[in-house]
Amino acid sequence: MKIRSQVGMVLNLDKCIGCHTCSVTCKNVWTSREGMEYAWFNNVESKPGVGFPNDWENQEKWKGGWIRKINGKLQPRMGNRAMLLGKIFANPHLPGIDDYYEPFDYDYQNLHNAPESKHQPIARPRSLITGQRMDKITSGPNWEEILGGEFEKRAKDQNFDNMQKAMYGQFENTFMMYLPRLCEHCLNPACVATCPSGAIYKREEDGIVLIDQDKCRGWRMCITGCPYKKIYFNWKSGKSEKCIFCYPRIESGMPTVCSETCVGRIRYLGVLLYDADAIENAASTENEKDLYQRQLDVFLDPNDPKVIEQALKDGVPQGVIEAAQQSPVYKMAMDWKLALPLHPEYRTLPMVWYVPPLSPIQSAADAGELGSNGILPDVESLRIPVQYLANLLTAGDTQPVLLALKRMLAMRHYKRAETVDGVVDTRALEEVGLSEAQAQEMYRYLAIANYEDRFVVPSSHREQARKAFPEKNGCGFSFGDGCHGSDSQFNLFNSRRIDAIDVTSKTEPHA
C-alpha cells in the first residue's frame, strides 16, 4: 500500500443555475490571451447536447481514454507506442478549430466612429485568429445553451445510447440539465501516458495534473488522449495548456477561482486519501459497470488508525490527513454516495464528481404527477431519464444513480416533516439506509453549508519545496528533458518528471 493525497471536487448539479460565472472568471484569469482565445478550461454545457468541443464524448471518433486488452492490461485507445509514433506528424483524431469554434470579437469602434447615415451602425464579428471579418458565427462554447437548436443535432449526444431518444424530441417530454466541466485531474490520466515528450505529470502532494511548458514540444497527442478534451493547443506559443486547478491558490489553502466565484455554491473541495498501488487493478476492471465501485475501493478511510499510520510513513503531512477527515468530497462520494464520477468507462478514474440533478424530479413529485414506491416517489419514471444520468455518470449502471436520487429525496422528505409538520418521520430514511445524523449532515452540506464547510483545502508545506536556484540561467539547448538540467538520457516516452539538480550542494566552499 502506497498512500497518496488528492484534492478532489464535487459539483452539485441539483443547484447549478447555468450562469457561466465560473467559465467567465476562469477565462479572465487563465486564458484571456493570444493563442488561447478558443480555450475554456471551465465551460458549462446544456445537456442533452454534443457539448464543447463538438461530440467530445464520442471516443470512437476521438480515441480518448484507455481500453482493456485481452490480457487484462490497459492501453491508450489511440494505440501502443508504435502506433503513436506513426501518427506523431499527422494525427487523424485531433479536433480542429471548427470542432471548437472560431473565436471572435466585434468591431465596437464602428459604433463610435461610423459616419452619419440613414441606417444604424452595427458591430460586425471579426476573427481573433485571422483578424478578418466573419460572414457568420456558426458555433461557440455554449452554442446549445438552454436547448438551443433543433433536437436532431442534440440527439447526437452519446448519452442517449440504449435509449429511445426520439420521444425526447417532443416538447412535452423534453428535459434539460447543466453540466459544468473542467479537467478531471484523473488518478490514471491518459494524457500523461500519450505525451511523447513526457511533459505531463501528476503532483504527488495534491494530485493536480500539470503540463511542463519547458518539456512540451507541441505534439498534441495529449489532446487526443484526454477523453474529456480539456487540453488545448496554444497556437501562439506552440505548447499545450490545460486547467491547472488553480494550484497557486490551492497551495495557499484557497479554493479554485471557479469554486470561489460560483453563484449557486454548487462546488465543494476536499482531500481524499487513496492507495496508489491499487489504481492499475481498479482501472483494469473487466466490466465497465464495475468501474465506479472499484474506484471507490481505491479510496481510504482517513479516520482509520492504520491508514493514518501508513500515510504518515508515506510522507503525507498531518495537516493533509486532518483535512481529509473533514473533506466534503469524501462525505458525498464515500459516506453518502451522492456524488458520481463523469464517464468512468474511460478508465481514467476522474476526480471531479457530480451529484445528479433532482430539481425537475422534485417539482414533478410535488405536482402529484408521479407514482409512489413506498414513502418516496418512483424515481424510475421521472422527467430526466435515469438511464441518461447513468450513461453520463456510472457507465450505464442505474443502481448508483437511483440510490443517490432516493437519498436526496429521503433527506428532503425528512426535513420537510421536521420543519413543516413538526414531526420526526424516519420512514424515508430507513428505506434508503440513512440515519438521522446523516440526514442532518446532508442537509447542512447541501443546503446551508458555510464557506469553510464547502472548501477544506490544506495549505502546502513550503519546507518541502525545492530550491529555485538550479533553475536560474539553466536553460540551454536541450531535447526532451527541457530546462530542468537533468543528466539523464533522453527518453521519448518519459513517464516521470525529471527534477532539477541542486548545483549548490555540489559546490565546495572556498578556503
Language-model features, listed with the residues they occupy:
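Non-ligating segments of multi-cofactor redox enzymes
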Residues: 1-511
